[in-house]
Amino acid sequence: MSSFFKKISVLAANCLWLAVCMPGWALFLIATRRVKSVQTARLRRILRQNSKTEFGRRHRFDSLRTPEDYLSVPLTDYEDYATAIGAIQTGHANVLTAEPVELLQPTSGSTTASKRIPYTRSLQSEFKEAIVPWIASLYLARPSLLLGRHYWSISPNTEPVSRPEDTHSRVRVGFADDSEYLGTIQRLLTRLLFPVPSEISQVRNPRSFEYLTLLFLCRERDLRLISVW
């Protein structure tokens, strides 16, 4: 691919990504004008949908209506959910969510031991809804981003992906690629806009992973954005 054609392709891909994000960005701006009502409605929907789960029954979700009501649910940390997540991993349903758990996503483990976070289809959709206005605002605030490529690192594979309990897990452990956080069109665009091949995520050795990532980044002359979550 010639340098000129590559630049035109990158510009076109970035412009298409911005165009795809604009409706979601506009809806987000509208929602910011009535934050309390939007958040209250979302909370009610979550409580209603999960009122019959083990967690929902334990905390009487069917009797909660407002954010103030929800204050009766005690603060917790990850250890409080370890047994429930273990049950989900062995195939139990309706534990924390009424919706089926699509996968358990490991955290990076940079500050504490790696955790397994249950992801449902709705949660993945909410991530996509949150990413869309963020991407649009980046492009609008920094138009020069349209001229180059991006590097995103959400869940780097700098640790062995599996644990003993993962071997017989009834639920998939981990996204195959960070682009799964995105919508279908955006995932297709990442193939052109991300300089580090998705296959690098399959490298399990931390030093090799970091070396190969750095190698591809150093080769990219038009890198405009680095986003590490």
Placement of each model-derived feature along the sequence:
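Active-site phosphate/ATP/adenylate-binding loop shared across adenylate-forming ligases
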Residues: 2-33, 37-38, 43-229
